[in-house]
């Protein structure tokens, strides 16, 4: 177990720490981009479904409940099945491809039924996060796992600050509202 140091306990210290492991830099960068993209769901889902499909607050609420429930099922059940069948690397690639497909379909669908299909594809793509985190954990020494998880948590926290204004601004720009 390592001693706690204040200079390492911040997002910039996290970046410095993670830069010491070149093998995980691309993985961490992908986690950051995926996290920013995921925050678009939280930030603009209601606006998007109202704008494109004229949904009311009840439909939006139901859709968010479905998103939450399906996400739980994916994380509690599907992740372990896919990890055994595919392994972490292929599961990460599979999940990232599904998420990209889901986002693409969100952007261009004109039909609500396809939106719901895209939502399922997107949610299953959530397996990538677990896979990528597992890969990064396997690269870092055991006595530094806490610092790794803290660093990743710190960076994900930063995306939580950056993404909502970024994504709502993008939505506003492209819809003219």
What kind of region is each of these model predictions?
Residues 74-88, 171:
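Helix-to-loop junctions at the C-terminal end of transmembrane segments
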Residues 169-177:
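A membrane-interface helix-boundary motif in multi-pass transporters
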Residues 43-60:
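Short amphipathic helix-loop junctions that connect adjacent transmembrane helices
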Residues 57-58, 140-154:
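Loop-to-transmembrane helix entry/capping segments in MFS-fold secondary transporters
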Residues 1-29:
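Juxtamembrane intracellular "pre-TM" segments in multi-pass secondary transporters
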Residues 32, 65-69, 120, 150-158:
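Transmembrane alpha-helical cores of Major Facilitator Superfamily
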Residues 20-44, 120:
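Pair of pore-lining "gating" transmembrane helices in MFS-fold secondary transporters
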Residues 89-132:
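C-terminal transmembrane helical hairpin of 12-TM major facilitator-type secondary transporters
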